[in-house]
Regions:
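Folded, non-transmembrane soluble domains that reside on the lumenal/extracytoplasmic side of membranes
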Residues: 1-141
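C-terminal single-pass membrane-anchor helix
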Residues: 131-167
């Protein structure tokens, strides 16, 4: 992940933990620095089990295996988060389709998008506001309102000029 993304995740994770008690971790295996064999599903499951034993519930872990090109989103307890919905609706559409697209920027965008949506879902469940998160749906609503106001203003100006010129 790129540096800005790491700083964003650390800040949001800290705020999420302080407000909800839920830990949210992104685990990215770095095969250049730590060459462990995780190409097979069984190897990844064993790695995940070992990693998850270190954490105390409630938690969410986002596993990203670069070389295997696999992603796992794990929540404990399982009803903490709808991991399948987040994966298939928010992460899967951004998955690279070939090896050339596996750039650090693309990976960061994909992980941050899924992470941000998951944090929003947790914040909503715990009735808290995570200030440092993107809050994408709220931003989209704000932009739509501004566009509608501008359109109505232009329409009003046009109609006003049209009717006042006639009289």
């Amino acid at each position: 992940m790129i540096e800005k993304s790491v700083a964003f995740v650390e800040g949001v994770s800290k705020e999420l933990y302080l407000k909800t008690g839920v830990r949210f971790v992104i685990d990215m295996t770095d095969f250049e620095k730590n060459p462990i064999a995780l190409a097979l599903k069984k190897e990844r499951q064993n790695y995940q089990e070992g990693f998850l034993k270190q954490l105390k519930p409630p938690f969410v872990v986002f596993f990203f295996y670069h070389d295997a090109q696999k992603i796992e989103l794990v929540a404990n307890p399982k009803d903490l988060l709808d991991t399948d919905k987040i994966f298939f609706e928010k992460i899967a559409p951004l998955l690279p389709t070939n090896a050339k697209e596996y750039t650090s920027q693309r990976i960061s965008a994909m992980l941050i998008n899924g992470y941000s949506v998951a944090v929003d879902a947790l914040a909503e469940k715990y009735h808290v506001n995570i200030v440092q998160n993107f809050n994408a749906p709220k931003g989209v609503t704000f932009v739509k309102v501004v566009i509608y106001i501008l359109l109505l203003t232009l329409l009003g100006a046009f109609l006003g000029l049209y009717f006042f010129k006639k009289s």
